[in-house]
Amino acid sequence: MARLAGVDLPREKRMEVALTYIFGIGPARSKELLEKTGISPDLRSKDLSDEQLAALRDVIENNWKVEGDLRREIQADIRRKIEIGSYQGLRHRRGLPVRGQRTKTNARTRKGPKKTIAGKKK
């Protein structure tokens, strides 16, 4: 089983898809990575040679932050916004949508399950 950036790549998937299992590598970056290393996107991860794995590892480590480093950087950015008291930091602190989405309706994922309030008595 091929292992890159601390992630076991699925054996039977094409490399183009298998690389997207790494946090921080999506479809576009996966194609770019395969072009840089000269590996065919149709190759399965079980068929990779050690040299190809080493080439992939080198390009990933030298060009991009992925997995734990990227997650830490994102968390640090959120913490910084909260500390400086920006509007986005305030939204993060309150657990509300950060990027201007409406909250009168929707936003259930960010706000959590509905908290029912007793209706008005007649």
From Swiss-Prot:
Annotated Gene Ontology cellular component terms: cytosol; small ribosomal subunit
Coiled-coil segments on the chain, per record: none
The organism's place on the tree of life at top rank: Bacteria
UniProt-recorded Gene Ontology molecular function terms: rRNA binding; structural constituent of ribosome; tRNA binding
InterPro entries reported in the protein's UniProt record: Rbsml_uS13_C (IPR027437), Ribosomal_uS13 (IPR001892), Ribosomal_uS13-like_H2TH (IPR010979), Ribosomal_uS13_bac-type (IPR019980), Ribosomal_uS13_CS (IPR018269)
Biological process (GO), any one: translation
Family under the similarity heading: Belongs to the universal ribosomal protein uS13 family.
PANTHER family assigned: 30S RIBOSOMAL PROTEIN S13/40S RIBOSOMAL PROTEIN S18, SMALL RIBOSOMAL SUBUNIT PROTEIN US13M
Record protein name field: Small ribosomal subunit protein uS13
Phylogenetic placement of the source organism: Bacteria, Bacillati, Actinomycetota, Actinomycetes, Mycobacteriales
Gene field: rpsM
